[in-house]
Amino acid sequence: MRTYTPKPGDINRQWHVIDATDVVLGRLASQTAILLRGKHKATFAPHMDMGDFVIIINAEKVALTGAKLEQKRAYRHSGYPGGLTSVNYAELLESNPVRAVEKAIKGMLPKNSLAAQQLGKLKVYRGAEHPHAAQQPKTFEISQVAQ
Protein backbone atom coordinates (compact mmCIF):
# COMPACT_ATOMS: atom_id res chain seq x y z
CA MET A 1 0.00 0.00 0.00
CA ARG A 2 1.38 3.39 -0.98
CA THR A 3 1.77 6.30 1.41
CA TYR A 4 -0.91 8.94 0.95
CA THR A 5 0.44 12.41 0.19
CA PRO A 6 -2.18 15.16 0.30
CA LYS A 7 -2.46 17.48 -2.66
CA PRO A 8 -2.87 21.24 -2.15
CA GLY A 9 -6.48 20.93 -3.32
CA ASP A 10 -7.21 18.28 -0.68
CA ILE A 11 -6.50 20.64 2.22
CA ASN A 12 -9.67 21.66 4.03
CA ARG A 13 -9.03 24.59 6.35
CA GLN A 14 -11.33 25.35 9.27
CA TRP A 15 -11.53 28.51 11.40
CA HIS A 16 -11.28 28.13 15.18
CA VAL A 17 -11.83 30.79 17.83
CA ILE A 18 -10.19 30.36 21.25
CA ASP A 19 -11.09 32.46 24.29
CA ALA A 20 -7.85 33.00 26.25
CA THR A 21 -9.57 34.17 29.44
CA ASP A 22 -7.79 32.52 32.43
CA VAL A 23 -6.06 29.97 30.18
CA VAL A 24 -2.42 29.23 31.03
CA LEU A 25 -0.19 30.73 28.32
CA GLY A 26 1.83 27.56 27.66
CA ARG A 27 -1.24 25.36 27.27
CA LEU A 28 -2.83 27.92 24.97
CA ALA A 29 0.33 28.09 22.84
CA SER A 30 0.68 24.31 22.67
CA GLN A 31 -2.90 23.69 21.53
CA THR A 32 -2.76 26.58 19.07
CA ALA A 33 0.50 25.31 17.53
CA ILE A 34 -1.12 21.89 16.98
CA LEU A 35 -4.07 23.53 15.18
CA LEU A 36 -1.80 25.78 13.09
CA ARG A 37 0.37 22.85 11.97
CA GLY A 38 -2.60 20.55 11.26
CA LYS A 39 -1.38 17.75 13.53
CA HIS A 40 -4.96 17.11 14.66
CA LYS A 41 -5.89 15.93 11.15
CA ALA A 42 -5.58 12.38 9.86
CA THR A 43 -4.01 13.69 6.64
CA PHE A 44 -1.13 15.51 8.40
CA ALA A 45 2.08 15.80 6.40
CA PRO A 46 5.07 17.48 8.07
CA HIS A 47 6.36 18.98 4.81
CA MET A 48 3.10 20.79 3.96
CA ASP A 49 1.10 23.57 5.55
CA MET A 50 -2.02 21.60 6.52
CA GLY A 51 -3.17 23.72 9.44
CA ASP A 52 -6.31 25.64 10.24
CA PHE A 53 -6.87 29.32 10.92
CA VAL A 54 -6.92 30.23 14.62
CA ILE A 55 -8.42 33.36 16.18
CA ILE A 56 -7.47 34.09 19.80
CA ILE A 57 -9.59 36.62 21.68
CA ASN A 58 -9.11 38.17 25.14
CA ALA A 59 -5.32 37.89 24.93
CA GLU A 60 -5.02 40.43 27.75
CA LYS A 61 -6.66 37.96 30.17
CA VAL A 62 -4.20 35.08 29.65
CA ALA A 63 -2.74 33.54 32.83
CA LEU A 64 0.82 32.72 33.84
CA THR A 65 1.51 30.35 36.72
CA GLY A 66 3.90 30.79 39.61
CA ALA A 67 6.19 33.81 39.64
CA LYS A 68 6.53 33.98 35.85
CA LEU A 69 4.91 37.42 35.68
CA GLU A 70 7.91 38.93 37.47
CA GLN A 71 10.70 36.43 36.71
CA LYS A 72 10.18 35.44 33.06
CA ARG A 73 11.64 37.92 30.60
CA ALA A 74 11.00 38.55 26.91
CA TYR A 75 14.07 39.55 24.88
CA ARG A 76 14.49 41.32 21.57
CA HIS A 77 17.51 42.67 19.75
CA SER A 78 17.73 45.74 17.53
CA GLY A 79 20.59 44.32 15.47
CA TYR A 80 23.10 46.87 16.74
CA PRO A 81 25.88 46.16 19.25
CA GLY A 82 24.47 46.47 22.75
CA GLY A 83 20.94 46.47 21.36
CA LEU A 84 19.53 43.69 23.53
CA THR A 85 16.47 44.82 25.48
CA SER A 86 14.35 42.79 27.86
CA VAL A 87 11.07 43.25 29.67
CA ASN A 88 9.34 41.05 32.21
CA TYR A 89 6.01 39.48 31.31
CA ALA A 90 3.99 41.67 33.70
CA GLU A 91 5.00 44.75 31.69
CA LEU A 92 4.68 42.94 28.36
CA LEU A 93 1.15 41.71 29.10
CA GLU A 94 0.13 45.21 30.15
CA SER A 95 1.62 47.00 27.16
CA ASN A 96 1.21 44.43 24.37
CA PRO A 97 -0.53 41.14 25.30
CA VAL A 98 -0.87 40.21 21.62
CA ARG A 99 2.93 40.12 21.30
CA ALA A 100 3.26 37.90 24.40
CA VAL A 101 0.82 35.33 23.00
CA GLU A 102 2.34 35.39 19.50
CA LYS A 103 5.85 34.96 20.95
CA ALA A 104 4.79 31.88 22.95
CA ILE A 105 3.10 30.28 19.93
CA LYS A 106 6.00 31.08 17.58
CA GLY A 107 8.36 29.25 19.93
CA MET A 108 6.27 26.08 19.61
CA LEU A 109 6.23 26.02 15.80
CA PRO A 110 9.02 24.34 13.78
CA LYS A 111 12.08 26.42 12.98
CA ASN A 112 11.79 26.12 9.20
CA SER A 113 10.25 27.88 6.21
CA LEU A 114 6.74 26.61 7.00
CA ALA A 115 6.62 28.51 10.29
CA ALA A 116 6.01 31.87 8.57
CA GLN A 117 3.05 30.44 6.62
CA GLN A 118 1.63 28.84 9.73
CA LEU A 119 1.99 32.03 11.78
CA GLY A 120 0.16 33.89 9.02
CA LYS A 121 -2.95 31.87 9.88
CA LEU A 122 -2.87 33.10 13.49
CA LYS A 123 -5.01 36.10 14.43
CA VAL A 124 -4.68 37.41 18.01
CA TYR A 125 -6.88 40.15 19.46
CA ARG A 126 -6.58 41.96 22.76
CA GLY A 127 -10.31 42.13 23.50
CA ALA A 128 -13.38 40.01 22.83
CA GLU A 129 -14.16 41.42 19.37
CA HIS A 130 -12.72 40.11 16.10
CA PRO A 131 -13.50 40.95 12.45
CA HIS A 132 -13.72 37.33 11.22
CA ALA A 133 -17.40 36.58 11.80
CA ALA A 134 -17.93 35.99 8.05
CA GLN A 135 -15.67 32.91 8.24
CA GLN A 136 -18.03 31.32 10.83
CA PRO A 137 -15.31 30.14 13.22
CA LYS A 138 -16.00 27.22 15.54
CA THR A 139 -15.30 27.57 19.25
CA PHE A 140 -12.32 25.54 20.43
CA GLU A 141 -12.28 24.78 24.16
CA ILE A 142 -9.07 24.34 26.13
CA SER A 143 -10.02 22.21 29.11
CA GLN A 144 -7.37 23.29 31.64
CA VAL A 145 -7.78 26.78 33.08
CA ALA A 146 -5.87 28.58 35.81
CA GLN A 147 -7.07 28.23 39.40
UniProtKB/Swiss-Prot annotation:
Gene3D superfamilies: Ribosomal protein L13
Any one GO cellular component localisation term in the record: cytosolic large ribosomal subunit
Keyword hit for Ribosomal protein: yes
GO terms of biological process kind: negative regulation of translation; translation
InterPro entries named among the record's database cross-references: Ribosomal_uL13 (IPR005822), Ribosomal_uL13_bac-type (IPR005823), Ribosomal_uL13_sf (IPR036899)
Superkingdom per UniProt: Bacteria
One family name in Pfam for this protein: Ribosomal_L13
Record keyword Nucleotide-binding present: no
CDD domains: Ribosomal_L13
Keywords, sorted A to Z: Ribonucleoprotein, Ribosomal protein
Recorded GO MF terms: mRNA binding; structural constituent of ribosome
NCBIfam families: rplM_bact
Function: This protein is one of the early assembly proteins of the 50S ribosomal subunit, although it is not seen to bind rRNA by itself. It is important during the early stages of 50S assembly.
Summary of subunit composition and partner proteins: Part of the 50S ribosomal subunit.
Family per similarity comment: Belongs to the universal ribosomal protein uL13 family.
Protein name, per record: Large ribosomal subunit protein uL13
Protein species of origin: Arthrobacter sp. (strain FB24)
